[in-house]
């Protein structure tokens, strides 16, 4: 092969290689999008792995309320059955020890202890806040006086559910909207501490929720 032709072929191959590399670089956004999708997938699995599942039987149905995500999820064991993507809670946020009149939603593990099917909020599933653990914590920290704590324990022992007249308040639960606008809970938090979903959603939950069911609020 003549030397001049060899030089031309070499230059051509170098040009093709350079063009190919440039072409790959021009597709960088596509590569980035694949990476982003992968990162999103990893993030999703990380979030699922981060869920702290309570000690429940595989067939036990329970409720998990994620205030940060504003989501109510129904689980059977560790399997998610359904998710309600929007909810409203207390106008003043949330706290483990929720005080009477604070408009905060309590955080913790609770049990449904009553159902009101004549509620002005369409349906009301009450939870056992304040629990004995929270009441004891409040007493130790000075929020409840000795007399308040004695009243709490006596009332719960007599009635099987916590009182609502101590400084910790009560009457907390999951309910619908009643006669309020259907999209209210998507606009702002408006409750005095309860968890609110739409009337349609609370009626859908009725087939699952029952007295004794675990409700985890985080």
Predicted regions and their residues:
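N-terminal pre-domains immediately preceding structured catalytic cores
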Residues: 2-218
């Amino acid at each position: 092969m003549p030397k001049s032709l060899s030089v031309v072929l070499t230059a051509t191959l170098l040009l093709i290689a350079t063009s190919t590399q440039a072409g790959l670089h021009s597709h960088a956004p596509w590569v980035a999008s694949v990476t982003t999708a992968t990162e999103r997938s990893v993030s999703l699995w990380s979030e699922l792995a981060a869920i702290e599942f309570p000690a429940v039987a595989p067939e036990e149905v329970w409720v998990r309320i994620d205030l940060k995500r504003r989501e109510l999820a129904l689980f059977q064991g560790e399997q998610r059955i359904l998710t309600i993507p929007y909810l409203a809670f207390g106008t003043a946020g949330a706290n483990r020890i929720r005080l009477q009149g604070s408009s905060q939603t309590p955080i913790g593990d609770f049990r449904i202890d009553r159902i009101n099917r004549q509620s002005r909020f369409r349906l009301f599933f009450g939870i056992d806040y304040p629990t004995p653990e929270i009441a004891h914590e409040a007493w130790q920290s000075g929020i409840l006086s000795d007399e308040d704590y004695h009243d709490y324990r006596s009332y719960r022992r007599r009635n099987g559910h916590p009182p609502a007249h101590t400084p910790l308040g009560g009457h907390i639960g999951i309910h619908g909207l009643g006669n309020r606008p259907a999209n209210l809970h998507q606009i702002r938090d408006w409750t005095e501490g309860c968890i609110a979903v739409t009337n349609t959603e609370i009626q859908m939950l009725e087939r699952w929720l029952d007295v004794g069911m675990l409700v985890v609020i985080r």
